[in-house]
Structures are given as C-alpha cells and as structure tokens.
Amino acid sequence: MKRALLKLSGEALAGEKKTGFDEPTVTAVAHQVKEIVDSGVQAGIVIGGGNFWRGRTSETIDRTKADQIGMLATVMNCIYVSEIFRSIGMETEIYTPFQCAAFTELFSKDKALAALKAGKVVFFAGGIGHPYFSTDMGTVLRAVEIEADMILSARAVDGVYDADPKLHKDAKKYDTIPIKEVVEQQLGVMDLAAAVLCMENKMPMTIFGLNEENSIINTVKGKSNGTVITV
C-alpha cells in the first residue's frame, strides 16, 4: 500500500469519556501512524466530529447551522490530533475546503499531494465545506482526490454487522462485503452518496475497531480483524 486515507471516528478518539479527547488513545494512534509513515506509506487523515457535536440529533437548530457546527468540530479535532502527532516528531498539514487562515490551509489537491509525497501527515478537516453532506462523503471525496489505495475507517465498532451489535447479541460480522450489498441492505455503514462515490471510483475500504491493539498497523498490513468492503 502506497497511500492510505485514514478516517478516525471522533467518538472513538473520546474513549470511554464519550466527549472530548482521550489523550492516551490519540497518542497511541499517533505512534501507529508514525510507524506506517516511517515504513513508506503516505497517510491522509479525516476525523469525524462526533466527540463534540452530532447535529442530526438536534431538533431546535437549523440543519445548515447544525452541519456548520459539525464542520468546525472536525477542524478542532484535526488541530488537536495534529499537535499530538507533532509532539512525537511528525510533520503535518491541515487543509479545509473553506478559509480558516489562522489555523489551516485552503484545500488544494496539488498542495496536498506534495505534502504527502514529502512524508507529511495530511489532515482534511471541514468535510466538503457544505451542509447536508456527512463526514463520510468528505472522506471518500478526499480519498479519491489524493488517489488513495484504500480508506481505513477506524471506529468504535470493529466492523460491519448484519444488525446493530449493541442491540442484537447474535449480530453477524462480515469479513468481507461488496459495497453494492452495503447499499442494497442499508447496513448504515456510510451514507448513500458516499457509498455511490466509493462504487463509482472503485475505492475499497476496511472498517475496523480503533481500540484493538495496533489495529491501524495491522490493517495497513492486510491483517485487520475488521470488515473489508470490496468494490
């Protein structure tokens, strides 16, 4: 694998606290990413905002404003995680699809690719910059734009199941599943627009549990205990 787009769940980064950050978890992620970058893999990262804000659960705030708050939550997450990465000697860049000059660079495919090729970890914050599109869509879009080999989606749940494992103890986890089946069975892995973009661009994805030891490294090596979504 030459280039990967790592999607980190904001909720997973919060650990058992459910909100904010669990610094040992974030530091462990940083060390794993450093190891794969040192091995020659270029790493882009998208982080969800669920540890700060889940706008779709709000009944009082306008959807556009709720989504904008969510975009800013991802910017905060990327700034924090980027600094943890820097603290262990990694070089980073943060890109957003909107002006945020004091904190980030305006996204440019050429600049992002140059940073990746220079060995920097590149964070993509702010989704696609528009409401009504989830972080899933931002993840797939950036993966396609940077020509990633695969999306690595690190979550609180360790794969794709045929039912919610929190509600159904007999839920079955898939080792592999075609993206077409994910869409047809409405498994809730990602939103429909993101799934279609994956399918159209033949972008594979592995979904795995962030809390498993060395899960990111193992997934890059093809030894994940999660679910591989094929295209």
Positions of the model-derived regions?
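C-terminal catalytic "cap/lid" subdomain
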Residues: 1-231
